[in-house]
Amino acid sequence: KIDADVEIIVGKSLGTIALSHLLKNYPETRQMKTIWHTPLILSQDIQDVIKSHSSRPLLVIGTNDPHYDVSALEDLLQSTDGVAKVIENANHGMEVPGGPQALVEVMIEIVKKMNAYIQSE
C-alpha cells in the first residue's frame, strides 16, 4: 500500500525499474508526479510504462548517457506532455567535463528544474 501523503515518486537509473513497477501495480501512484532521473529509456518496458501510466513526467538525462536516445525521449515527451532536462555531455552519473565545479553547476541546474517541476500544477 502506498501512503496517501506521497505526491511525488522518483527513480534514478535502476530505480526507474522500481518506479515502473509501482506505476504498473499500484494504480494510486498514477496520479503522482514522477521524476525519471537517468531513466533506462531504451527499455521498451520502461517506455511503455511512462507512456501509459505516467502523466506529465519529468525526465532528466545526459547526452552522453548510454541510455539516451533523442528519438525515444521526444516520443515520450510527446506521448505524455512531459518535460525534460537534458544535460549536454553528461554521462549516466551526470558527470561532465570540467571537473568538480562543472559537476556542481549541473547539480544546481537539475535541482532547479526539479523544484520548478514539483511546484508546477
Task: Go through each PLM region and give its residues.
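Primarily recognizes the serine-hydrolase "nucleophile elbow" in alpha/beta-hydrolase
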Residues: 1-55
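Conserved beta-strand scaffold positions in the cores of enzyme catalytic domains, especially
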Residues: 34, 84-86
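Cofactor-binding loop segments of dinucleotide-utilizing enzymes, especially the Rossmann-like FAD-
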Residues: 39, 62-63, 89
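Short beta-strand/loop motif that positions the catalytic acidic residue
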Residues: 53-54, 59-61, 65
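Acidic catalytic loop of the alpha/beta-hydrolase fold
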Residues: 63-68, 92-93
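Conserved loop-alpha-helix segment in the C-terminal half of the alpha/beta-hydrolase fold
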Residues: 69-82
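Catalytic histidine-centered segment of alpha/beta-hydrolase-like enzymes
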Residues: 90-106
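C-terminal alpha-helix
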Residues: 109, 113-121
